[in-house]
């Protein structure tokens, strides 16, 4: 075969392969894309937003700057927060209100909803209803909140991690159940559910009217059925979360799904968490994700870097893709180090790790 014949036959073969490939591609179903986004909770100052854009973030949640002396963000505050984010190529997707935080009730500035104190709780609920209306007017689709009395429970001493990092930990056997009651006193499961129901009955219809998603964080961590410090932790189990969502069924009533916290509810999180993600995700009840890993299990765990915990994050992100989850994956409770007291290096590590996972799972088809 001379050179001209070789080139001619090679070209014909290439054309045939190309034609076959085109036919095969045309007949194949389009690849399933990963819809989730890298995100974080943040302040909305320009310098901070610029630094987040540097790491490839395009979506955030947080509290907007407020006028001095004001407790609640006004509509203009929300618009300024959204505009500040957009100026840096970032979407402001979820608002953090000034009440119903994860702090312990004795430190909470506005505890009336969780203490069932009237008329103060009705006033606070009205303020949240106004926030929902303002979110709709400002073009921000969701807000997140906690229904917690004890706040986030951890042991005072941190645990050595890799390098010079330290990790937060919880071990119920090493905690102090005899710790005095909070100002809430004894709160049985029935009383806790009454307070939750009172809140949801007044908030969910407004959220539906204005099409704003309400994303509730589970109680962190779950504790035994007898509770802790006199408080039954009703949102500290998977069954509790299911009951919570059933109280007022709505596409706008769902979860700020802290994967770390839910893992803390389980005896074998590495095996169990995937089906939990699948359960809530397939029902479109996951509005935001705190993408955090642990080593351990219910009542005894350590919060670690995302790549070294008991939950396989590759498998986890595949399930989020499977259920078409389209919200944010946020780092949360990152390790600390002596030269990184604010955790910025740890957050940067998590941003890169999560971004790479999203890109990888997107290519898997």
List PLM regions with ranges.
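Structural motif corresponding to the early beta-alpha repeats
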Residues: 63-197, 201, 208-209
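Surface-exposed cleft-lining segments at the edges of enzyme active sites
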Residues: 180-195, 221-232, 303
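Residue-level marker of alpha-helix boundaries and capping positions
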Residues: 39, 72, 122, 193-194, ...
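Active-site-proximal loop/turn and secondary-structure-junction residues that shape catalytic pockets
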Residues: 42-46, 66, 96-101, 147-151, ...
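Catalytic domains of carbohydrate-active enzymes, especially glycoside hydrolases
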Residues: 44-63
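C-terminal segment of N-terminal export signals and the immediately downstream linker at the start
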Residues: 20-43, 50
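Histidine-acidic metal/acid-base catalytic patches
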Residues: 3-21, 32-35, 114-115, 126, ...
